[in-house]
Amino acid sequence: MSMDHQDLKRRDPPADSESQRPSKKISLSSSEASVPIGGPPIDQNLILFQNRAMKVRVEEQKIEINDREQKIKQLNTKIHQYKENISCLCRVWDQLNSGLDLLINRVDFENAMDNLLPKDNITESFEFLSSYITEPVTLDEKYTLDQSLQKKVQKTQSTFSKISKALEKEHTLSKFVFRLLKSKDGIKSNDIEKLLKEDNDKLSKQNQYIQNIYDKVQIQFKQLTDQTTHLADQAAIYQQNNKELKLELEKSQDELTIERKRVIKLQDETLRTPQVKIPSPSLGSNIPGGANNNNNNNNNSNNNNNINNNGNNMGGSGSSSLASSTNGINKQQSNDINGKELTHEELIAELQRQSDSRLLEARKLREEKAILLKELQQIQIDIRVIPEERIQNSMPYQVLRQRYQLVSDELDIHRNQCTKLQNDLAQATIGRRLEREALEAFEAHRRQNIERRVSQLEVESIELKGEKEKLVCLIEQRNPNVPSLQYIQESRLLLDKKDDEIKQLRKEIEQLKLDIEKYKAPKEEIERYKLLVQRDVESKNIEINKLLEKINTITKQNNDLKSNEQQLLQKESELTLSLNILKSNKNNININNLDKDNIEDNSKIKQQQEQQQQQHQKIDNNNKKEEEIKKEQQQQQQQQQQQQQQQQQQQQQQQQQQQQQQQQQQQQQQQQQQQQQQQEEQKKDKEMIDIEKSTENIINNNNNNNTNEQKLNEINKNIENGNNENNNNNENTINNENTINNNNNENKDKIIFNLELNESKLKLELSTVKKQLEDITKSKEEYDNEIKEINEKFKAQIKELDITISQNKIQQESQKQELEALVMEIDSMGKAYEQMLEQNTRLTKQLSDKEDTHAHLMAENIKSQQTIRNSKEIQLAIEEKLNRNEEKLKSQGELMQKIEEKSNILQKQLSKVTEDLHSCSFDLEKHKRFVRENNAHSLELKTQLDHLSNLNAELKKKADDSIFALEREIDKAKRLDEEKQLLKKKLEKATSANNNNNNNNNNNNNNNNNNSSSSEEELKLINQRLRCTICNDRQKNYVIAKCFHVFCKECIYSNIDTRKRRCPSCNRAFAETDVHQIYY
């Protein structure tokens, strides 16, 4: 019940949860604001989300609680089973002890052969039994068993020790007898064998007898186990029945207390009813004569005697109520009984009889109530006699106690959780406010950053424009014949496109500014679009940088080519000078040597040079012819294409003129556009041709330069070698001349001698010169061969260069294709950029559509983040609680493992004990008797309960009837009292009238007195009418609206309090709302 109550408490939402939540106000400055409490909530989706989350949490917590309850139930069942096992173990242990006692009594282990044993101590032990029948292991101090269990363990250990000792004695006796038999000489081996066989037979019979007993004991043990299970089930049923009986007794006690209270209330009401008021003697003092006084005194004395007698019989408490109960009879019965008029004395006698009979009935009822009270007291005493230890030691009481503890612990835990959740809610509200303020500041800061970024982009666009203008100026300063003009024009077009794109971006930025001022775009989408725009701008900037780098590389290449051409020209002039010098040197050599061979060689060299020059001229002419042929072919192709296009256009014009005469203006416009396109195509083709020519010239120049450089290097080498040889010859001639001059200057006497010597020397020199000439001729031949080889090498190199030229042409064509592909890519990039611009426009439109809901989305995002944070905190708290619970469960599992280990040890001990069980009948009989006694006692209690319940029902009925009868009698007694008073007054009037008639003549003055007495009587009657008919004390204040009978306030509300709610005069039912006050 406590858990259900707790769940109900959980399900109840907090009282001021919705009223305390701040609602939203639609504004542009702030995303959230407070709304009056009476206004409707704006963020209903968030409330639904929170409700769903709370439902999920509650369901998860319920599942966790159910799992924990199941685990607790499992633990309780295990503990219950453990306790039942212990109880069964105790029972079996008792049975085992009793069986062992019986076995010891039946079998005499101690024989009369003790005297035959030797006096020396026998050290041997019966190892077989000691190994087979081991004493149970002593329990550790950790195991906290009851004292009864420990005593039982000690008993079993002592019995097993006795059995082992007896068997050891028997073994020692058998050994001793065997030794005695061996020691005797008169006894033969056959006799010994016979004795041993007899002993073996006896032992086998004893073993069989013991085995039979053991089998019977096992059968009895099985039966006892079955009976114990059956008895345990019956005991549980009886416990349940006892519980039900206790509950019924408690209910009966509650009902009896209620009835006692009702009886006490009735007694109080009867005490409240006043006694019969006798008229005071002062009222009758004015009446003449003493007869009236005597009569009144007699009547009063009779009434007082009756009242006193009734008071003695009923006791002091009920005297007034019963005295008033004698005054309740109808007016018709008072005046007429069986059609006869009765006197006043007869009426009084009948009333006394009725009151006596009713008093007797009341006495009987009181006696019956006293008997019932005694019986109830006896039942209470019987219940109290039940010992508290028995109730406390019972399993259900302990289980209930444990459950109560668990439930109390869980209640404490849940209370702590509730307090924590309340604190978390308070912190969450504070956190929401702080986060709102932070978000407002963040949005303002973000707007400022966006405006700064826009200004930075404008500055960057202005800088790009300046750089573009500088580039345009640099490009215009260059020569238009440079082959990079096409790239420059393309770059200009791209730059113009970029300018247009930048202008469009500026327009879009201005639109975005306007849109941002109007609306608020969501944060994430704005960041995404910013990133996209930045990426596009960066990609375009990268493309611009690449184009600028290409332009710079092309300009550098052109500059390098120009410098190379200048260098080549300088080298050619230097080579011409070097050739002239070589020629002059060669001429000098030829003049000095005067050899024909040298002249022929020079002519050959000249011829070779001329041939080389002619070959170069031929190659150049061939290249020029090929270029001219290509140009002519291209021009022819262009002319053919133009002619074809013109023919097609003429055909189209003719068809259009025939079919559509009305659309001549449009056709003219189309023709103009087509002509412009043709011109642009022609321009493009010319530009491509110029580019091709320039590339071919560059390649040829490079190749020619390379070949010329190689040739010049070889020629320089040859010239250097020739110069060296000529220098040697010149030195020789100069030496000869010097010698001649020296000889001329010498003495004439020695001229002849010197001439002879000179002739001899000259001969020698001539011979050496001839040898040198031969060597020179050989060297010339070698040089000729080398020149031939060099020519061949140059021819091979020329062929290789032709091959490289063809390859370069192929590469040039591939580069053209690549250029075309790049142009196509640039076009595609432009189209993609236009598509991106269109997408940007669409996205701006989407942003303008979505900016209306941005405030709501931001608020929902904030709240969702807060709920996520709260949920994370709650999850962390739940995880901590789960960890704690898991630790508790682990500790409980460890305890259960210890308990299971204990139970396993006990089960092992049980398995050992059950092997040596012999009898368990006495305990069974005891239990049976106990169960029978319990059955008989329970049957008696049931019969008593049934009897008491019947008595209670009858007493309730009787009490209700008696109460109803007493109330009626009280009303009748009150009415009778009123009638009595009226009759007394009538008697007084009659007596006074008689006296007046007798004394009319004598006392005329008494008329005045009679008139005064009659007026007093009228006043009394009026007072009686104004007084309440129930109590005759208080005035009538309240009216019952249904029957219009008037009573005093106290009497009516006493009727309402007793839940009777019927009119005392007409017995008509009424409600508390039918009672109204009267004002005189």
UniProtKB/Swiss-Prot annotation:
EC number from the UniProt entry: 2.3.2.27
Positions with biased composition (Low complexity): 25-34, 284-312, 319-330, 994-1014
Coiled-coil annotated spans: 50-91, 149-169, 196-269, 331-1003
Gene Ontology cellular-component terms listed: HULC complex; nucleus
Gene3D superfamilies for the chain: Zinc/RING finger domain, C3HC4 (zinc finger) (3.30.40.10)
Subcellular location(s) of the protein: Nucleus
Compositional bias (Basic and acidic residues): 1-21
Keyword flag Transmembrane: no
Keyword entries, A-Z: Chromatin regulator, Coiled coil, Metal-binding, Nucleus, Transferase, Ubl conjugation pathway, Zinc, Zinc-finger
Source species, domain of life: Eukaryota
Catalytic reactions of this protein: S-ubiquitinyl-[E2 ubiquitin-conjugating enzyme]-L-cysteine + [acceptor protein]-L-lysine = [E2 ubiquitin-conjugating enzyme]-L-cysteine + N(6)-ubiquitinyl-[acceptor protein]-L-lysine
UniProt pathway: Protein modification; protein ubiquitination
InterPro entries attached to this UniProt entry: E3_ubiquit_lig_Bre1, Znf_RING, Znf_RING/FYVE/PHD, Znf_RING_CS
Region (Disordered): 1-37, 274-335, 721-742, 991-1016
Listed PROSITE patterns: ZF_RING_1, ZF_RING_2
Function text: E3 ubiquitin-protein ligase that mediates monoubiquitination of histone H2B.
Similarity-based family: Belongs to the BRE1 family.
Protein name from the UniProt record: Probable E3 ubiquitin-protein ligase bre1
The organism of origin for this protein: Dictyostelium discoideum (Social amoeba)
